[in-house]
């Protein structure tokens, strides 16, 4: 398992975790969340389990550019840290967004450069990294 955490992860007691993946060479990072369990649709009358364990042990994030860098530089060039675990989906999603806002993932830049400090290109599925910088007042139409 590549995840580092101040204590042992506890999938039986928690729904998922918020994580930080950091490129050790550039300090560029990614903040995301991962569920320990996924619901399984049961056939009527079945006694099969209602959830199955996710791929959290080997999971390396969902950002395309992060995954490309991991493939190019190797997994050892990255630090995989669990920030905190949460007992339900609502708390998990809330704190994922909380940490993304806390770290200012959409507008932070690497020190001394204009390169984004985070691999995150959007948060909450609604707010995206700007494609261009806002330079002037919007044009007023009559």
Predicted feature residues:
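Structure-specific nucleic-acid interaction/processing domains
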Residues: 1-141
């Amino acid at each position: 398992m590549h995840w580092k955490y101040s204590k042992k992860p506890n999938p039986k007691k928690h729904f998922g975790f918020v994580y930080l993946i950091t490129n050790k060479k550039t300090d560029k990072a990614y903040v995301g969340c991962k569920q320990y369990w996924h619901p399984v649709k049961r056939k009527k009358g079945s006694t099969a389990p209602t959830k199955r364990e996710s791929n959290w042990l080997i999971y390396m994030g969902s950002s395309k550019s992060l995954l490309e860098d991991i493939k190019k530089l190797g997994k050892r060039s990255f630090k995989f840290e669990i920030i905190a675990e949460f007992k339900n989906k609502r708390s998990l999603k809330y704190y994922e967004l909380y940490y993304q806002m806390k770290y200012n993932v959409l507008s932070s830049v690497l020190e001394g450069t204009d390169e984004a400090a985070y691999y995150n290109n959007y948060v909450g599925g609604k707010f995206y990294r700007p494609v261009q910088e806002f330079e002037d007042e919007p044009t007023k139409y009559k």
